[in-house]
Amino acid sequence: MDNDFILVLDLGGPQAVEMARKLRNQRYYTEIMSRGADEELFRRKAPRGILVVGGDGYSEPFPKAALALGVPVLALGGAARRMIETCGAVSEGILLKEQASQITFKPCPLFDQLSESDRYFARVDGFALPEGFVSIATTLEGFSPAYADLERRLYGLQFYAESNDPDGAVILSNFAEKICGCTPIWTAKDFLEEEVRYIRERVGNGSALMAVSGGVDSTTCALLMHRAIGERVTCVFVDTGLLRSGEAEQVRNTFEGELGLKLISVDAGDRMLNRLRGVIEPTEKRQVIYEEYMKILAEVGREHPEAEYFVEGTIYSDLLARGSSDAVYARRFDPGKRLEPIRMLFKDEVRILGELLGLPRALAARQSFPGPGLAVRCMGEVTESKLALLRRADAIFREEIQLAGQDKKLTRYFAILDDTRTVGRRLGVTTREYACVLRAVGEQGLASYTVGKLPYDMLERAAARIIREVPGINRVTYDISPCENTFVEWQ
């Protein structure tokens, strides 16, 4: 992409990912950088412009390295307040808080094609503007939620481009193209052609092993590698014993049958359960599973010394989550021999790429599944008997969701086995069995979720079937915890 891109500087919160994805959806390439980056890193990246977002609870000064580069800067939300203060503004206190107002845009490149709009403001502060800055918008109350130094191309808006916000999309597009000079050329098809060329140049006549789980990310990456180097990529599927009902067999059938890819399948269920014996804490579960998984991949690597490269289906959200850590690779391989072909793609872009590569539509729409599998949906110690209960309950819930036609409205839906035993009755006999929790969420915007509003009669059917068909579970609840206060997963 050379330097034809916007760098999104994340000061904290979910907005950075959402803004980056909005720009990508308009075909402008973006990369995200976390706060704390020094000026030298900014210069090496050499973006056309910088979008700074987040920081509503961020008390540190605005990153001066973003201002020192001399490229256009657009700061949104709390970042806009930090920027104007760093440039010498004096705060006059909070003028608006958590309310909607009409905003009138003044003529400037950022607001081209816009005149006025109704917006929600989490907070608007008043400022005595420093030299060079002018107000570029006013609210109905006469307050200024936006300002700019037009000569230095510094813009601050005390609001965000919201979900389903056409005016916000125009503002982002104006910044990228009319102010920064970026070209809207980012498409999955162009990425595919460019990445195939890169993989062929990098691997040459060599061969590779690729870790796959059967999910959208790793399957798409496997198809990409196969497009680039054909039979010289061999997929490695580790059946950890922590997958959903019938999933391991489905993965093997899909890769070897439907997709025609070379596959090594490793049955590691007993081995993984032995390592998990006595482990209760979620963090420790994840660590144990990760360590054992990587040991298995390293063993497979040693059994196939002809494979010079190790490939992972890492996507951009994985990259952002792990930060500067560079430890996610099989130990048999030199880090320089690791490939992560789709590491700069968001999940929705991976699905689009997958369809271009011939990924079956049903698999492209497959819901996300946590890396540690059912271990993080099984509260307390993970045992074979508890996993069996969870698989059966989960399969029933998923079946009822699909029968009710709710699957197209939801992003994720699954069962959780609580470690609590409750009093119940089965065939007239008092029981003390496990409680099961059902969870369903839909996507709201690009980086947030909302609780699934499922039909009550459907929930009743699912609960009745689980209690009737799964001895060992005598209570079913539905988790309606709001997603702004809780994670989608329980662990």
For every predicted segment, state its role.
Residues 322-323:
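Short, solvent-exposed loop/turn and secondary-structure capping segments
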